[in-house]
Structure formats: C-alpha cells, structure tokens
Amino acid sequence: MSESSGSALQPGRPSRQPAVHPENLSLDSSCFSSPPVNFLQELPSYRSIARRRTTVHSRDKQSGTLLKPTDSYSSQLEDRIAENLSSHSLRNYALNISEKRRLRDIQETQMKYLSEWDQWKRYSSKSWKRFLEKAREMTTHLELWREDIRSIEGKFGTGIQSYFSFLRFLVLLNLVIFLIIFMLVLLPVLLTKYKITNSSFVLIPFKDMDKQCTVYPVSSSGLIYFYSYIIDLLSGTGFLEETSLFYGHYTIDGVKFQNFTYDLPLAYLLSTIASLALSLLWIVKRSVEGFKINLIRSEEHFQSYCNKIFAGWDFCITNRSMADLKHSSLRYELRADLEEERMRQKIAERTSEETIRIYSLRLFLNCIVLAVLGACFYAIYVATVFSQEHMKKEIDKMVFGENLFILYLPSIVITLANFITPMIFAKIIRYEDYSPGFEIRLTILRCVFMRLATICVLVFTLGSKITSCDDDTCDLCGYNQKLYPCWETQVGQEMYKLMIFDFIIILAVTLFVDFPRKLLVTYCSSCKLIQCWGQQEFAIPDNVLGIVYGQTICWIGAFFSPLLPAIATLKFIIIFYVKEWSLLYTCRPSPRPFRASNSNFFFLLVLLIGLCLAIIPLTISISRIPSSKACGPFTNFNTTWEVIPKTVSTFPSSLQSFIHGVTSEAFAVPFFMIICLIMFYFIALAGAHKRVVIQLREQLSLESRDKCYLIQKLTEAQRDMRN
C-alpha cells in the first residue's frame, strides 16, 4: 500500500485505491512508515499511552500498541522458542499445528550442529520429561475414587464434586498422620512386644514422689455382662482402655535396641508436632492454590454477568435433570447478583434514620445470637461436669441405658446444639437485612464457630475439672488424681466418644431419616403435606461443616488417642460411600448452590480455622497441665514439654548454645522484625502487581477498541472507494 493510501484512511479524505485487506492492515508495516501519517495517533490505545508517557517510554509514538512491524518480532519469537525447546515442550506454546511443526523442524536442524555431548543432553532431557509425563498419567489412574468422583461431576456438576474431593483429601491426610504416628510410636512398641527384633522395653524409673499419685485403679474382673462390652466399645472404657488405642498404654521410657535406645517420650511428642505441622503445611499449600484461582477469577460486576451468561455452562453435565438444575442455578446466581446490586443501591439511598434503625436491630439480634451461644456453651459445661462426676461414682449401679446415657451426655448435648442453632441462626438473619451472599457467609461463619467452639468448651471444661479438686491431691500431684488418675486417657475417651457418636448420627440420619423421606415423597405423592416437606437437599456447606467438625476432633484427640487418625480414616471412607449413595438415591442437589463450592478454597479455609482451634487446647495440655504420674510415657516429667529441654541438654555444648540462642528473645525479636519487613515487601509487590494487572486489563480493553476503530475506518475507506 502506498503513502497516499495511508492518507486515504484519514477522516473525510476519499480514495480511489484498491480495497484494503485487514491482514495487510495488521501485518504490513510499510503502510504506516511515512512520517506525515497521523492516523495511528487517533487510536484509543495511543491516546492512553500519551497520557501515561511518563511511565511508558518504550512504546513507539507512531505505531501505538497494536501496529508494530511484526516480521522481526516473529523471527525473534521463533528463535527464542527454538532455543527454549530443550527445556519446554512444544505443547506448552499457544501455536497452531503448522507453526509447531515448523519449530520442530528448526529444532532438528539445530541439533545437527551441536556436539555429541549436547545432543546426548538434549535427548536425555527429553526422555526424562517423557518418562515423568507417563508416570504422572499413571498416577492419575491410581487416584483414589477417581471414577466415582468423575461420575458425580458428570451427573451433578463441579459443586457437589468439590465436596467429595475435599472428603478424599481428608482421608489421605488422616492416613498420612496415622502412618507418622505408627512409624514413630506404634512400630517400635510392636516390634518389641511381639519379639520381632532383638529389643527390650526400658521401664520408667519412678522418682521419689507420693505413692498416691502413682495409683491407677484397675477395673474389676468379676462377672461381666454382655452389654458391658458394647458400652466399652462405644465409650472406650473397660478392655479398650488398656489397649494401644489410648495414651495410658505407653507407660515405658524407651525401647532398647542393640546399638541405641529409642526415646519413646520424645518420639510420642514429636509425632504429634509433626502431624500438626504437616496438616498446616498441606492445608496452606492447597489454600494458596485455591486463592490463586480466586484471584484470577476476581472480576468486576459487569464481567461477572458476562461470564455467567456466555461462559457459565458446566459442560461436564450429561444428565437432563442436572442440566435443568444448572439452568435454575444460573438463574438463581443472576438473581442473587441483581439482588446484591439492588441491596447496594438500597444502602446508598438509606436515610440516617433508617441506618440507625437497621444497626440497632442488628445489634439486638447479635445479642440474641450471643445469648444462644452462651446457653449452648453453658449446657455443654453442665453436661460435662454432671457426666464426669457421676461416671466414677455411680457407674456400677446403673442399668445399661442409663449408663450409656451418662457416658454420652456431653456428646448428645453437643450434637443437639449443632442441630438446633443453625435453624435459629437462619431465622434470625432474615431480619438483619443483609445481601443474600453475605447472609450465607455470615450464617456459615456462625455455624463454624458454634461447631468448633463446642469442642473447645468440652476440652476446657475437662481441663478445669482435671486441675481443680477439693482435697490436697492437687498440691501433691498437680491435678485431680482421685477423679482422673490418667487424665490423658480420659480426654482421649471423650474425643473417641465424640468421633463414634458423630459417625452414628450421620449413618442414622441417612438410613432412618433421608431414606424413609425419599420413600414417602416417591410413593405418597398425593399427600400435600409430604410434597411440601419434599425430598432432602444435599446441602454442601452443612456437609462440609460436618466433616470439618470430625477432623477437628481427630486433631485434638490424636495426642490422647494415637489410633484416632486410623479410626477417622475408616470413618471418612464409609462416609464417602454413604454420602454417595445418599446423593444418588435419597437426596437432591440444592437449587441454590454455594458459590464457593466450585473451588476448595472456602472448605480449606474452614478446615484451617478448625486446625487453629485444635492447636490451642493441645498447646495448653502439653505445656501447662501436669502430666499423669500413673500412666503414659511422661510420668517423670512435670509437663509433657519438659522432654524437649531434657533432650537438648544431651546435645554437645556448641549445639546447645546455638539452640538456646535461636530460641532466645535476642534472636526472636530481630527475626520477627525481618519477617515483618519481608511481609511488607511482598504486600507492596502484590500491590504493584495488582496495579499492573489493572493496567493490562485497561490495555486489553483499549486493544478491542483499536480493532473496532480500525474496522470502522476500513469500512469507511471501502465505502469511499466504491463511491
């Protein structure tokens, strides 16, 4: 195209030149090489760059952002890609097949001019990457419940699939925790107990202490009724109390092998610390991945509407009814977005009197919420105190049902509180005048706090009973030895009962509530009351809160009951199949799906809250409450944590000095300041990246406006040529 044709594209200048093709307009740089042409200065992107010229100096003033000469750029891109082919696969590049073939030919041509050593390195690198890809593909086929989860995703979409993927993650997490405890604690004991290795137990040398603190009463071995075994199995007492399931079984100081002595108290404590640290790192890693996805998906409201309308369909759905459900869920999400938009507009238009009235009502309703929580916590406290006092005094005088009720009274009260309070919160929040999305988040937050705080209330109630007594026993032993001769085992029994009772409730609700409800809705369709009752919905947030509750129990109880992670693994495996059967045959997906269910970020965030709440009572138990003197591996230590300073004292003096220096305040304060500076740096870096992302989004918008502008000018030029 000549210079005159370039000027013909200016507004109001007719032209007799041939028609201009878009590919020539975008690729041929000669058409914009003449200095008098000022057409490109009219592009929206060029005007934006002119306004930001102080920050963008590398832009070409004549060619804007789109219309640069592309021949040299393409050749440089090809050379760069060809050079990097040795470290990246061709499939990673966004190129068509012909370009990939051309680049492959370039690579083969370059290989001929390399030395034999470089050729061997290239081929070995390719072979190793190909092997890793094949191994990665094979591991995906070995993934637990892969076909089941894919089937659920195909029938019910990605929302419900995320719950089952989260459940699979908890199964794997508990399995790894159990393997850590098994390798560090159980395996040395089993090898010695069954004479598998040439080793022996090192008994704990009892120090000079009051004999009253070392008394551990053994249950009577007289006539035992059959139902006593059922009670023992459900409560962890009796024959289970003396097994390796609980803390009191490990009353040894170590295991002596041929060449060394295995320090069991240290291994017992380190297994708990390692389990919690692994859980924290694993959850944070997966949370960061989900947070990255949420950052990528963060968008403006207009973009959110466009994405839901043009890209909101889930192509994994193959079932007709699920497709209808997806239609309704998209419709609900659009309604929710519009409702939130109306709510924002309503908030902006509120008068000062309405604002005062709304906030006063919210304050009053939040006081009611706090009163409900306080009543639940007090009920758990009273039930725990009543159960602990009567369990030791009158347990032999009770019949089977009364005995079981006393043992499970705290678990029953906690389950009732977890069942009733969500319904109360759902009724209260309707009057607080929040947006629909915030209503869901606030309700879930209250339910999370309720479920997890009940466990903490139970543990702290037990702790208060353990450390308080009426006589001088607490002065002698440091704890209530008369009521709790081995208090760690009894705390483990409470966690065991919570785990078993939660599992029984899940099975009972599925088999005796959901299944009969499905039968009534199916075969009694003429009854209007039953049809109004309807089929049970598969509520994702409620199910997630249930398994997070069970996992929090497992974290707290793993120190007091080392086999509890194995029980939790079996429990979650059974729950997976029960929930899958319930989803397929008794439940229907909720027509109002939780929006964060498309990613596991929210689930992992709730799980992280549960882990933090579990660490608090464990830290207090390990560092503050005196260890039992009648059972367990820490009978010669005032607290469990004292095994760490004792072990450090056996190290060489130089290593001791280093450890004491690292753990001192002189090191901790500067280290904390450096960490804060690094954190501030990354926060500033994230802010800069965010600003760059905003600029790039603006630039993308300007690129599209450039295209529209060019098409408009091209159309005008073609119209002028026809005229």
UniProtKB/Swiss-Prot annotation:
Coiled coil: none annotated. GO terms for biological process: sensory perception of mechanical stimulus. InterPro entries: TMC, TMC_dom. Belongs to the TMC family. Keywords: Glycoprotein, Membrane, Phosphoprotein, Transmembrane, Transmembrane helix. Residues 1-28, 51-71 are annotated as: Disordered. It is found in: Membrane. GO terms for molecular function: ion channel inhibitor activity; mechanosensitive monoatomic ion channel activity. This is Transmembrane channel-like protein 7.
